[in-house]
Each structure stands twice: as C-alpha cells, then as structure tokens.
Amino acid sequence: MWYSKNWKDYELLDTSDGERLERWGDLILIRPDPQIIWKGVAKHPAWKKADGIYRRSHSGGGAWVKNNLPESWKIQYGDLGFVLRPMGFKHTGLFPEQAANWDWFSGLIRESNRPIKVLNLFAYTGGATVAAAKAGASVVHVDASKGIVAQAKENAALSGLSDAPIRYIVDDCKKFVEREIRRGNHYDGIIMDPPSYGRGPGGEVWKLEESINELITLTAQLLSDEPLFFLVNSYTTGLSPLTMSYLLELKVKARYGGEIEAGELGLKVTQTGAFLPCGASSRWYLK
C-alpha cells in the first residue's frame, strides 16, 4: 500500500461505523466512507468535537451539518497550498491519499534533469497539477467543470505558482485527447483520475470499467519519444490496480519498456495504526 508520511495539515484520526474522523488543518470533520464496515473499539475523543459532519439522506443525497465549519479554509502539504470547501457528495476538494502519488512523480520530474511536459486529465482541483508544476514541469490541466478549474487556479496561487507554465482547459477529457492526437502534440508525463461513473453531454452513461481501455489506448498515443511516466488512478471497486497495470503493459510498456507498479492508496489511522484503503493506482515509468 502506498501512503504519504508527510502530511501535517491532514490526519485520519479514527474510523468507525461507516465514518471517518478527520483533521483538516484545525478543523475536525466526520464523513461517510463505505469501506469502513467495522465498529471502532477505542473511540477518539474528537468524535464529539466535529466542526462539520456530512450526513447521507435516505434519498441517496446528503448535506453538511455545520457546527463551526467555515465556507472555506486553507491547508498546506509541504510547499503546496490548497483551499478547501464543504462540497456536495461529502467532498472537500482534495483527496489526501493522492499525496503518495504526488511525491512519486515529483521525484521523477526533479531527477530527470530535463524539461518535462505533463498532461493531467480529469484534473479536479489540481493537487497533481501543482505538485508537478512545483517539481518543475509544465502542465496542461483538463477538467470538464469550470468551477473546479477555477479552484485549481486558486490552489496554484496558494502554492506560489500563479506564473508557472500551467495551461487550464475546461473540456471533455476524451474529446481533448482526440484533438491533441490530431494536432500532433505529445507529453512526457500523463496523469489520469477518471470518475467511476458519469454522463456525457448527450446524456450517455459513462462507466469506467467499460471505457478505461479506450481511454488509455488513446492517451498513450500522446506520449513523447522519451516519456517519463504514466499514472492511472481509480476509485472504482470493480476495477483492480492489476487490471489497469495490464492495460499499461499492453499500451505503454510494450512500446517503451520501463517498469510498472500497481497498488492501493491508503491513509494511516492515528487511533489504531491500521490503514484505510482509498482507491488504487497503476504506475508506468521509465528508469
């Protein structure tokens, strides 16, 4: 399991009964998590001091119960800054487990000693974007949500990257990739974090299990002659990291050689010392 030991502003304090108890900066949140199927034995005292709780409704939605929870606040991960907001579907605008991936590809970028161009697809609020840019890469950040891309720009500013070579694109990621292929553009590093489920502009249903093969096949065509890495993330339970790594084996390693790693991402629980699984990643990289 991959996890980051470098968080100071985030902490998974405890887990129990389908919920996480988390510290985000100075604020304590309780959020639902379907992976937490156990009942806690030793309850952390902060369970009774939450600033915000996300409660699911019987209709399938949910809402934040705010005690002392502001509309927004800021945290740091090393020299990276992030603005957080209580959002729909229990989210805050950041997935802290992804810091393990940020550390990994940032090291590759720094050690390459050459200009690196990165494409970040389904880039959300730009955690990976600012990590890559801070490591010295130029980045093309693509997400279909205008509001989310605006928050990514805020995170870049908080990270001291307002003038960094980051290009923000509000677009459907697959259509953008297809256009980049026609334009003949190439990238040294590719990051993709596709959603498990979605609907296209015409109302068509999009499922990751049915689309990941085509998505990787298309995007692999954008790799440069000397690529550095290709990272695929998944929060889809039915799509194992080994399945994604097999696709990277066929579409990337077969052409370039290199190494492939596959594993789960996790967060260490302070109260128990155990790890909470938080999705999976498959990594290809060229040594």
Q: Where would I find each of the regions flagged by the language model?
A:
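Non-catalytic substrate-recognition/targeting regions of SAM-dependent transferases
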Residues: 6-22, 29-96, 103
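Conserved alpha-helix/loop element of class I SAM-dependent methyltransferases that forms part
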Residues: 96-114
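Conserved class I S-adenosyl-L-methionine
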Residues: 114-124
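Conserved SAM-binding loop of SAM-dependent methyltransferases across substrates and taxa
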Residues: 125-137
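Conserved SAM-binding motif I beta-strand of class I
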Residues: 138-143
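S-adenosyl-L-methionine
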Residues: 145-191
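S-adenosylmethionine
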Residues: 173-253
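C-terminal catalytic and target-recognition region of SAM-dependent MTase-like enzymes
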Residues: 227-287
